[in-house]
């Protein structure tokens, strides 16, 4: 199964990056940086939420109804006349539900690394969140995922499946960030390959390679 960053680098993903950048007035490369960091974090947060029966059922319902992937069928129309406020409101609701009280810390950490303020990161994620849910809904349909257990497996697969635990630890660290400088420094070290353990593959290695200069 393709990982979430593979999907982001596909033709569909590039179209999403371009559209989100245009609709938020943000440079495409910075938008790509934000999404490259944010998408695994959102997947990890959803995996956390889906660990409970209630959380899994809630996500299952969302993917079967509103977020079934159909939003991806007409991206030209979605971005053509400017993204509708209802899409942004939907995105804000998704982020609040997925990240809860972790949202501000996540946006601060990603903003620090992408060279954007947290408000700009929030605007990017509001537009991107319904599309991310659409990508997940599309994968759910293609993989014929019907049970909560299968859904957890789908999320794990998008995160890299059997990645070593240290490859996932930086996702936990971002989710638990509160804007504290030391946390941001720790996460920056992981993204930039300063954490040697995360440079050997999996998400940590992929991100280290993308952001290492």
Please place each PLM-identified region on the residue numbering:
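A structural "flexibility-hinge" signal
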Residues: 1-213
């Amino acid at each position: 199964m393709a990982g979430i960053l593979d999907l982001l680098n596909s033709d569909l993903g590039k179209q999403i990056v371009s559209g989100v950048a245009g609709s938020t007035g943000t440079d495409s490369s910075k938008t790509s940086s934000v999404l490259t960091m944010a998408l695994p974090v959102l997947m990890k947060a959803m995996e956390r939420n889906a660990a409970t029966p209630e959380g899994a059922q809630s996500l299952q319902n969302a993917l079967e109804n509103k977020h079934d992937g159909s939003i991806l069928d007409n991206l030209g129309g979605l971005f053509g006349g400017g993204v509708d406020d209802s899409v942004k409101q939907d995105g804000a609701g998704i982020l609040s539900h997925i990240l809860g009280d972790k949202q501000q810390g996540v946006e601060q950490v990603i903003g620090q690394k992408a060279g954007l303020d947290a408000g700009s990161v929030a605007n990017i994620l509001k537009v991107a969140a319904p599309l991310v849910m659409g990508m997940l809904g599309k994968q759910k349909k293609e993989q014929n995922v019907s049970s909560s257990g299968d859904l957890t497996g789908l999320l794990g697969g998008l995160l890299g499946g059997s990645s070593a635990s240290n490859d996932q630890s930086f996702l936990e660290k971002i989710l638990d960030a509160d804007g504290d400088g030391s946390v941001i420094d720790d996460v920056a070290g992981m993204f930039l390959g300063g954490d040697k353990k995360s440079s050997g593959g999996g998400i940590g290695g992929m991100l280290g390679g993308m952001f290492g200069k």
